[in-house]
């Protein structure tokens, strides 16, 4: 099993996303259910760290990122096989230009 770690940036992006969903849907339950879905998907990486896709941008591929797709959101991460750690660097909306958000 791999340890899952999120950077401060990823935590902030995730928090902002959940606040936005709660505000937009006028339902905290909708936001919390989506957070649960995202976190479950990220936790599955502890057992299947290579299950993410290859990013479409070459610069991200060259830097060793993988991407986990959850509905309209992307979680960018790297796998450290030596230390058995998956580090999540960013959680972004797939519809925005995200190269500079990671």
For the regions a protein language model found, what residue spans apply to each?
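Enriched for short, Lys/Arg-rich terminal
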Residues: 25, 70-74, 78-102
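Arg/Lys-rich, positively charged N-terminal/basic patches that mediate binding to nucleic acids
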Residues: 1-37
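Basic/aromatic recognition patch in beta-strand/loop cores that engages polyanionic ligands
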Residues: 52-81
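PIN-domain endoribonuclease scaffold, especially VapC-family toxins
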Residues: 5, 33-42, 62, 67-69
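Acidic/proline-rich low-complexity IDRs
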Residues: 13-16, 59, 100
